[in-house]
């Protein structure tokens, strides 16, 4: 499959300008934020961030205090960002990076300063992704990367010292198509993940049934002209035609990776070692042919895997992970609200929270540590069009 580099612009002049202008630029671009509560975190409390679609009443990104002992959420603040459908906090929790998912020139990556104690946001700046519909975003602390679904690309943004984003230094464009003429008419990048060892980046291409592999340059940052990503060997791993790779996750021990395929509704298990994937199993998560499988996560103890399905029989498929070989056994299915696009498990493993986009609610489920099964505790968090949940301990 042909792959081309659209641009490679190193932006020292832009960086200098950002340093000179500093907060004045940020204050000009900052949008309204509402402060609801000012208390800091206490024992068992997590800071929870929620990204939304803003076509309705939602304003953008919301912060909550979530108690992982009793499953209760308290609202803190919000910031107006358009269509922040995916977001990621920095490792220290001081910054949040979020996409603005649009199929036009509004497609962007946004940088925000975040006050963890108060739960408040301050927009630093936004940079165009150069690819439409950015739907996934990650950071290694030096760079931010977006997956641009309709743009058939991934974009790399160096991070300035103040946490803001410089213009894209690399935009990697992908070509090709798949057997599903309606959904795989071209490349569709849906997810990017850094491997547990921090050495590689994998990019899921729903349109071509591939996982692209890149070697990460840990030295690449604003101080040099080194590329963050270099094509790996092999350049990509191919999965069964028509699968539609969507999201990838890794086992806590780093030895296995699991891929949820949107179109086939299957989960593929891989052995992972030294940057290489070896397929070992394919198992159904969606048994009704909905072509809407979405998200995938593993419990903190590494014993259970969960995968969400949309469009028909909306819910979460539950699998036990064999401790010796990483193979999956399906053990249950939990029906949820409508369109469970995203979900997350608390760090202590007690709760699983589901962002049900079309039910306008985040559902809270208690997780049985022995069976992996879920029980709705009826502590719904009402919010318009929730599509991404992240925790900051």
Stretch-by-stretch model annotation:
Residues 293-325, 333, 337-345, 352-354:
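Loop/turn-rich, solvent-exposed surfaces of beta-rich toroidal or solenoidal domains
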Residues 65-70, 112-119, 157-166, 215-227, ...:
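Short loop/turn segments immediately following beta-strands, especially the blade-tip
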Residues 75-141:
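Blade-loop segments of beta-propeller domains
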Residues 74-79, 122-127, 176-182, 232-238, ...:
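A short beta-strand motif characteristic of beta-propeller blades
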């Amino acid at each position: 499959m042909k792959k081309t580099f659209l641009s490679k612009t190193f932006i020292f002049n832009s960086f200098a300008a950002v340093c000179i202008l500093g907060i004045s630029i940020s204050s000009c671009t900052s949008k309204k934020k509402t402060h609801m509560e000012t208390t800091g975190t206490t024992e068992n409390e997590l800071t929870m961030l929620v990204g939304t679609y803003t076509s309705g009443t939602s304003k953008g990104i919301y912060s909550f205090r979530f108690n992982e002992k009793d499953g209760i959420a308290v609202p803190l603040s919000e910031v107006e960002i358009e269509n922040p459908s995916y977001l990621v906090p920095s490792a220290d929790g001081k910054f949040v990076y979020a996409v603005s998912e649009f199929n036009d020139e509004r497609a962007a990556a946004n940088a925000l300063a975040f006050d963890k104690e108060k739960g408040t946001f301050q927009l630093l700046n936004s940079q165009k992704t150069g690819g439409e519909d950015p739907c996934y975003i990650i950071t290694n602390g030096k760079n931010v990367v977006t997956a641009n679904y309709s743009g058939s690309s991934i974009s790399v943004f160096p991070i300035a010292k103040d946490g803001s984003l410089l213009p894209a230094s690399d935009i990697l464009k992908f070509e090709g198509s798949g057997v599903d003429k309606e959904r795989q008419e071209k490349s569709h990048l849906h997810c990017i993940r850094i491997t547990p060892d921090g050495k590689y980046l994998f990019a899921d291409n729903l349109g071509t049934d591939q996982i692209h592999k890149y070697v990460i340059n840990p030295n690449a940052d604003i101080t040099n002209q080194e590329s963050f990503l270099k094509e790996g060997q092999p350049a990509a791993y191919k999965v069964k035609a028509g699968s539609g790779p969507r999201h990838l996750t890794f086992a806590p021990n780093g030895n296995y990776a699991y891929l949820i395929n949107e179109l086939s509704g299957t989960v593929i298990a891989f052995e992972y070692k030294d940057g290489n994937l070896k397929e070992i199993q394919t198992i159904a998560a969606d048994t009704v042919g909905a072509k809407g499988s979405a998200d995938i996560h593993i419990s903190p103890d590494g014993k259970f895997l969960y995968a969400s399905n949309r469009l028909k029989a909306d819910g979460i498929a539950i699998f036990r992970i064999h401790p010796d070989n990483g193979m999956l056994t399906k053990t249950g299915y939990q029906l949820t609200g409508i369109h469970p696009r995203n979900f997350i498990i608390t760090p202590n493993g007690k709760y699983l929270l589901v962002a049900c986009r079309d039910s306008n609610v985040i559902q809270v489920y208690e997780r049985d540590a022995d069976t992996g099964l879920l029980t709705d505790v009826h502590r719904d968090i009402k919010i318009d069009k929730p599509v991404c949940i992240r925790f900051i301990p």
